[in-house]
Amino acid sequence: MASLKKSLFLVLFLGFVSLSICEEEKRENEGNENEEEDENHEEGSEEKRGLLDLAKHVIGIASKLGKRSEEKRYHPFGKRSEEKRYHPFGKRSEEKRYPPIGK
C-alpha cells in the first residue's frame, strides 16, 4: 500500500511538472504571437498615418482650387484691397516720386 501511494504520488508529481512546463511554453508562444501582432499593428498604423497625411494634403489642394475658381467667378481681375484703391501704383512708387522733405 505504501509503495502504491509513493508511485501514485510520483506519477501525479511528474504529471503536474510536465503540465506546468507545457503551460509556460504556451504562454511564451502567446507572448511571441502578441509581439508579432503588435509589430504588424504598428506597421499598419504607420501605413494608415501615411495615407491620412496624403488624404489631408489632397483635400487641402482641392479646397484651394475650389476657392480660387470661386474668386475668379466673382472677381475676374483679382481682389482689390483698400490700399490698391487709394494707391493704385503702390506706396513705394509714390515715395520715389515725392521724396520726404527734411531728410
UniProtKB/Swiss-Prot annotation:
Question: Where does the entry say this protein is expressed, by tissue?
Answer: Expressed by the skin glands.
Tell me which UniProt keywords the record has, alphabetically. Amidation, Amphibian defense peptide, Antibiotic, Antimicrobial, Secreted, Signal
Q: Does the keyword Signal apply?
A: yes
Q: Which residues carry this modification: Isoleucine amide?
A: 101
Q: Per the database entry, which stretches of residues form a coiled coil?
A: none
Q: What does this protein do?
A: Fallaxidin-1.3 shows no antibacterial activity against Gram-positive or Gram-negative bacteria. Does not inhibit the formation of NO by neuronal nitric oxide synthase. Has no effect on splenocyte proliferation or smooth muscle contraction.
Family of this protein: Belongs to the frog skin active peptide (FSAP) family. Brevinin subfamily.
Supply the name of the protein: Preprofallaxidin-6
Species the sequence originates in: Litoria fallax
